[in-house]
Amino acid sequence: TETIVETAFGSDYAGMEIHAAAEKWSSDYVKEYRETNLEFAKEFESGEPSGGVFNWENQLNGYFSGRHEDIVSYTVYNYIYSGGAHGTTTEVAVNMNRNTGKLVNEADFFIPGYREALSGILSSHLRDALPDQESYDALFVKDIEPNGNFKLSEEGITYIYGQYEIGPYYLGIIKVTIPWDELGDLVREHI
């Protein structure tokens, strides 16, 4: 749970029990909101034009998102709006060996020298991950690379690309799934 706490709430909450971290994170967020908006509230009450945004939102959800053999994936979803044109959404996956509790990253999961082959497979599935050709044409890059943010399922491995990472904001989070049978010998045995 230590890794989940740090992924969900940040390094300031590392080492805390999950419920205590959630409570502190929530209270810290309210404190930040009050401190940030106090001056704007005073301006508003006095009738002066205020540049402040009083409508803040922060949604944080975590869930088990899949598994493959002994590896389980836990995903943390976060939407934040604290003013501006739009909010920001992030989705980060953490993979763990359920028998040992050890974190499993790309280098653990794939054989040495995997990046080039995996990049080609990811790129070949990118168009299928988008709703239409217009969305595909809007991407910043079409030859994508593994970014370390992946989750496992019965269907395959899914890479998660954040807003602005490979495409414009309006495309949102882009998820590219590769079926297990296409990964061939790239995956290590007995992780």
Regions of interest found by a model, annotated:
Residues 1-191:
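Compositionally biased intrinsically disordered regions enriched in Thr/Gly
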